[in-house]
Amino acid sequence: MVTCMDVNNLKLDGMELVAGESGLRRMVSWTYLVQTRPFEEHMNRGNFALIVVDYVRFDFKEVKKAIVELNDLGISGLAISVVDDKEFIPKSIIKKADELSLPLFYVRWKGASFVDISQSIGNLIMETNIMNKRTGDYLYNLLFGYNVNDRYVEKISGQFGLDFS
């Protein structure tokens, strides 16, 4: 399971947590680029939402409405980038994220990319899923395997950092 804390721990260039620290344990299922309403038709619970404030589709007034709606739909966290870094996220939005315990990240416009952020989060989710499957397979083989011997247990346990000696 990947959480917003894991996303924050990636220390992605140009991305910083600005609010909602109390919600960092929210589970992240995937990323979602916020563009089209109604949001519920395009996203799933646990999505990590990404919004670009471009002053055409989204301005900060629209973001303030969207943050409540997206939180009600179960997003895990929210990252906001502002075209050309024209301004920082308003204090009212930061306050709302804190009230909702919604992790809110600021993404620098220049040098940071939603594609890179999405890819990094996706890779983290996939790596975690693979590790969880390997752990599950290992435990299954320990419990129900027909040909489990001490050498197998020692070899596989070492891959998980376990020492049964």
Language model features: what each stretch is:
Residues M1-S165:
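Alpha-helical/coil-rich non-catalytic "connector" segments in signaling and regulatory proteins
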